[in-house]
Amino acid sequence: MKERIVNLETLDFEISQEVSLRPSLWEDFIGQEKIKSNLQISICAAKKRQESLDHMLFFGPPGLGKTSISHIIAKEMETNIKITAAPMIEKSGDLAAILTNLQAKDILFIDEIHRLSPAIEEVLYPAMEDFRLDIIIGSGPAAQTIKIDLPPFTLIGATTRAGMLSNPLRDRFGMSFRMQFYNPSELALIIKKAAVKLNQDIKQESADEIAKRSRGTPRIALRLLKRVRDFALVKNSSLMDLNITLHALNELGVNELGFDEADLAYLSLLANAQGKPVGLNTIAASMREDEGTIEDVIEPFLLANGYLERTAKGRIATPKTHELLKIPTLNPQTLF
């Protein structure tokens, strides 16, 4: 499948740009109000007790601000944050090296934490519970366990697939937060703030139009903003107005609902099944995409907006999908 403009993952060339647009204060972080309120209370209490924060888990689709909110937590706690990802922690020694370099109250952020191996999790458990690292030296009867005390720290785990976390690991997080999709007004405000940082003039209706097509995701909203800005520059316009915005978004292949070719192909596959469940492996094979991408990238927004149902037997298109694609739902009697 070709690269999608609405891809939820951070593209390589966007990493430095995303950092420059990242909010650094609570007042700059738009949306997720309930989560912010709970975190502010926890941070205030931890600072008054002069303790580290409880370990916390953020879960939800990519691009909703798990990393950004973790940076703000570190800033509010006046401490350091170490960023890593589970696939980078291949051996227990990798984790030990990270943990032994943490200072008191530091934050360790592990992205894709559901991908930690069971062996790594076993090393992590005493570190989370007792701030202790158990290292086994040697093997067989001569093996010895050396215990190393660790400074109190906070582990922040981030995952797009909370269901894949082992129960023992999930139970060790004192706080768990589900990141929600953003509404259009929140996204429009994010777009306006980002435009200021980019020194780009933008009309309110343009920000609203980009927000409407951003799939409830700030990462996509910022990507579309930068792409529309490119179109404005080529048109020799210093202002992003509605005409330029509509032209750019249509050229980029993002419709009024934020759907692209991949979304429409997915929905067409389900709708044409006429109420019969379609298995994930069948969908992945038909779209030439891996099952994880289907589950983590394509389905969440469609599911949240009522375009499909997940059943034990597979995926089923809803009446909303049939109406969108103008594919009639056949009467069951006409199928025979």
From Swiss-Prot:
Residues 256-336 are annotated as: Head domain (RuvB-H). Mg(2+) binds at residue 67. GO terms for molecular function: ATP binding; ATP hydrolysis activity; four-way junction DNA binding; four-way junction helicase activity. The gene is ruvB. This is Holliday junction branch migration complex subunit RuvB. InterPro entries: AAA+_ATPase, AAA_lid_4, DNA_helicase_Holl-junc_RuvB, P-loop_NTPase, RuvB-like_N, RuvB_C, WH-like_DNA-bd_sf, WH_DNA-bd_sf. Has 3 domains, the large (RuvB-L) and small ATPase (RuvB-S) domains and the C-terminal head (RuvB-H) domain. The head domain binds DNA, while the ATPase domains jointly bind ATP, ADP or are empty depending on the state of the subunit in the translocation cycle. During a single DNA translocation step the structure of each domain remains the same, but their relative positions change. ATP binds at residues 21-22, 63, 66-68, 129-131, 172, 182, 219. Its main location: cytoplasm. Its EC number is 3.6.4.-. Homohexamer. Forms an RuvA(8)-RuvB(12)-Holliday junction (HJ) complex. HJ DNA is sandwiched between 2 RuvA tetramers; dsDNA enters through RuvA and exits via RuvB. An RuvB hexamer assembles on each DNA strand where it exits the tetramer. Each RuvB hexamer is contacted by two RuvA subunits (via domain III) on 2 adjacent RuvB subunits; this complex drives branch migration. In the full resolvosome a probable DNA-RuvA(4)-RuvB(12)-RuvC(2) complex forms which resolves the HJ. DNA binds at residues 310, 315. It is found in: Cytoplasm.
